[in-house]
Swiss-Prot record:
<keyword id="KW-0648">Protein biosynthesis</keyword>
<dbReference type="Pfam" id="PF01765">
    <property type="entry name" value="RRF"/>
</dbReference>
<dbReference type="InterPro" id="IPR036191">
    <property type="entry name" value="RRF_sf"/>
</dbReference>
<keyword id="KW-0963">Cytoplasm</keyword>
<dbReference type="GO" id="GO:0002184">
    <property type="term" value="P:cytoplasmic translational termination"/>
</dbReference>
<dbReference type="InterPro" id="IPR023584">
    <property type="entry name" value="Ribosome_recyc_fac_dom"/>
</dbReference>
<dbReference type="GO" id="GO:0005829">
    <property type="term" value="C:cytosol"/>
</dbReference>
<comment type="function">
    <text>Responsible for the release of ribosomes from messenger RNA at the termination of protein biosynthesis. May increase the efficiency of translation by recycling ribosomes from one round of translation to another.</text>
</comment>
<dbReference type="GO" id="GO:0043023">
    <property type="term" value="F:ribosomal large subunit binding"/>
</dbReference>
<protein>
    <recommendedName>
        <fullName>Ribosome-recycling factor</fullName>
    </recommendedName>
</protein>
<dbReference type="InterPro" id="IPR002661">
    <property type="entry name" value="Ribosome_recyc_fac"/>
</dbReference>
<comment type="similarity">
    <text>Belongs to the RRF family.</text>
</comment>
Length: 185
């Protein structure tokens, strides 16, 4: 019975940790990542379609992304969608593909992204604490239903707290690593 509470808590905490890592991928480091274009949608035959489903998106070097559409007629639409996304660069259409040239990041931008990473970490910690509350409620329900004794409940609360502390540590480590990566020139 308690194992199902622990398993659900661990599963939910892993989801929160993975969501944090996904959020981190949207932060620009010293080199560009194609993930910055992940949330851009293009009008494709009257449907809003993810950019990566209508074009090949490649990071050609540390500061350039190339977007080559599978249909040449898509060039203008892709260029407009990227411009409208307001990601901090102006797309350049060379007739074959759309190129994005990212300027090197300033120290100020790096510090700003490090702050964002810290805020994302805090948000993830709040999620972990809410998951702990749900797990504790599950233990409380089992105790109320007389499925477990008071001593077992006490041990269960301690185990729930251990799991929470473990995931908070993992989040702190992930934030620390991301901050180091962001601030490294």
């Amino acid at each position: 019975m308690l194992n199902s509470v622990y398993d659900a808590q661990k599963s939910d905490c892993n989801k929160a940790l993975n969501a944090l890592k996904r959020d981190f991928s949207t932060l620009r480091t010293g080199k560009v990542s194609v993930k910055i274009l992940e949330n851009i949608f293009v009008d494709y035959y009257d449907n809003q379609t993810p950019l990566n489903q209508v074009a090949t998106v490649l990071a050609t070097d540390a500061t350039t992304i190339s977007v080559t559409p599978w249909e040449k007629s898509m060039l203008k639409g892709i260029e407009s969608a990227i411009a409208a996304a307001n990601i901090g660069v102006n797309p350049t259409n060379d007739g074959e593909s759309v190129k994005l040239f990212f300027p090197p990041m300033t120290t100020e931008q790096r510090k700003e992204n490090a702050k964002k990473a810290k805020a994302m970490g805090e948000k993830a910690k709040v999620s972990i604490r809410n998951i702990r509350k749900d797990a504790n409620d599950g233990v409380k329900k089992l105790e109320k239903d007389k499925s477990i004794s008071e001593d077992e409940a006490k041990k269960a609360y301690d185990e729930v707290q251990k799991i929470t502390d473990n995931f908070i540590e993992k989040i702190d480590e992930a934030v620390k690593n991301k901050e180091e990566e962001l601030l490294k020139v």
